Amino acid sequence: MKKFFRKIAGYIVTIYANRIYRKAVKEADRVHAERGEMIYVASSIEDVRELVIYNRYKFRQMKKRLFIPKFYISNLKDGAWYFTPDRSGKNGLTEQEREVRRLAFVQHVLHRAKLV
């Protein structure tokens, strides 16, 4: 019976993680369409299950405020769950990369919920 409830909890957490991811990606795409700048979707520092949207300026402010000297934009790009293309439309994620990162986020949330 315990395995059954664990499996149901896994499905619910998976649905929850997919919902959070899609919402953050939609918001990042909306901001990118308005401003044209590169937007990154990464995990929040306070709550790993929460996704935060950064642009480069906001990232630099957070870096100064939290005193993270060894974290650069290239680290953010590698560690982000999603990022939009730049102004010229280059350097964005392909559909395959996007799907891989979505699945990695779902696995990350399942791991944090101790269901994997």
Give the positions of each predicted feature:
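Acidic/polar low-complexity segments and flexible, solvent-exposed patches
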Residues: 2-116
